[in-house]
Amino acid sequence: TEFGPSQPFKGAK
C-alpha cells in the first residue's frame, strides 16, 4: 500500500 511504512510521505501528504 502507498500508505505503508515504505512510503510514509504518501500517507503524510
Curated annotation (Swiss-Prot):
<dbReference type="GO" id="GO:0006730">
    <property type="term" value="P:one-carbon metabolic process"/>
</dbReference>
<comment type="subunit">
    <text>Homotetramer.</text>
</comment>
<keyword id="KW-0378">Hydrolase</keyword>
<keyword id="KW-0520">NAD</keyword>
<comment type="pathway">
    <text>Amino-acid biosynthesis; L-homocysteine biosynthesis; L-homocysteine from S-adenosyl-L-homocysteine: step 1/1.</text>
</comment>
<keyword id="KW-0554">One-carbon metabolism</keyword>
<dbReference type="GO" id="GO:0004013">
    <property type="term" value="F:adenosylhomocysteinase activity"/>
</dbReference>
<protein>
    <recommendedName>
        <fullName>Adenosylhomocysteinase 1</fullName>
        <ecNumber>3.13.2.1</ecNumber>
    </recommendedName>
</protein>
<comment type="function">
    <text>Adenosylhomocysteine is a competitive inhibitor of S-adenosyl-L-methionine-dependent methyl transferase reactions; therefore adenosylhomocysteinase may play a key role in the control of methylations via regulation of the intracellular concentration of adenosylhomocysteine.</text>
</comment>
<comment type="similarity">
    <text>Belongs to the adenosylhomocysteinase family.</text>
</comment>
